[in-house]
Amino acid sequence: MFSINPLENLKLYISSRPPLVVFMISVSAMAIAFLTLGYFFKIKEIKSPEMAEDWNTFLLRFNDLDLCVSENETLKHLSNDTTTPESTMTVGQARSSTQPPQSLEESGPINISVAITLTLDPLKPFGGYSRNVTHLYSTILGHQIGLSGREAHEEINITFTLPAAWNADDCALHGHCEQAVFTACMTLTAAPGVFPVTVQPPHCIPDTYSNATLWYKIFTTARDANTKYAQDYNPFWCYKGAIGKVYHALNPKLTVVVPDDDRSLINLHLMHTSYFLFVMVITMFCYAVIKGRPSKLRQSNPEFCPEKVALADA
C-alpha cells in the first residue's frame, strides 16, 4: 500500500539537495521583500525621481550662506512706494505670459518673494548703524548655492524685507548683543532658468510686509560654505558686523511626489511578482513533501543494494 511520510520525506529532500533548499529560502526572502515594498509604495508618498530639484531643495541651499551686515556699509533711504524695477518681471507676469519658453528665457530676470526665517547675530565688538534697518540686500552667483551648468554663473539678487525695523542700539551702546529672529520676506531676482519649475511656496508682498514708516536698505556680503572652510579664510571677514543666516523649514506640499496612479501600478506589479514567487516556493515544498529523497540516491544507497542483500542471505 502506498503511504506518504511528509516529515521524513522533507528531511530526506533537505539533506539530499542543499543548493535547492538555499534557492527556496532565497526566493521566499525575495517574495517577502517585494510584498513589503509594494505595501510601502501603497501607503507612503514617494518623492519623484524624475524631478531633481523642487522648491524645498532650492531654498535649503540658502541655509549654507553667511550674510555679513557690516558697519562700513552705507544705508540707502527708500520711499514707501518703492516698486520693482521695470527691467524685472514678477513671477505672476512670467506665468501669465503667452510667450514661448525661448522668449521667456530672453525676457529678463523675474522676482519671486517667499517668507523665510532670518537671524541676525551681532558680533562683539559691534559697530551699529545710524538708522533703523528695514531691508537687507545682497548679490550672489549661482555656484555659491550649489547650482551647476549655466546657472552657476547667473547673478541672484536677494532682498530681505524685515517685518519691523531692526534697531541695534542696545548692542552698539550698551553691549546687549542678542540674536534677532525675523520672519522676513525674501525676494529673489534672477533669470527664470535659476528657479525650479515645480509648485512654488506661498508668496509674500514686500511692499506691504514692513510696518516701518521710514525704510533703510543696507548691503550685505554673502559667503558660501566653501569659502568659509577654505584655507585662505579671513577670520575678520565680518568684524564689528552682524552675521545673517537664512533658515527654510521643509514644506511637504512643495515636494514633488509620484502620482497615486503610478504608485498603484507599482504596487500591483510588486504584488503579482511576490505572489508568483510564493507559488513557486509552495510548489517546490509540496514536491519535497511528496517525493522525498531522489530515486537515484535511493537506488545507490547500500541499504537497497540487491547484491548485498543476496550475499547476506547466503
UniProtKB/Swiss-Prot annotation:
Keywords tagged on the record: Membrane, Transmembrane, Transmembrane helix
Biased composition (Polar residues): 80-105
Pfam families assigned to the protein according to its UniProt record, in alphabetical order: TMEM219 (PF14940)
Annotated transmembrane regions: 21-41, 179-199, 236-258, 270-290
Cited InterPro entries: TMEM248/TMEM219, TMEM248/TMEM219_dom
Stretch list, region Disordered: 78-106
Protein's membrane topology: Multi-pass membrane protein
Intracellular or extracellular location(s): Membrane
GO CC entries: membrane
Similarity remark: Belongs to the TMEM248 family.
Protein name: Transmembrane protein 248
Organism encoding this protein: Mus musculus
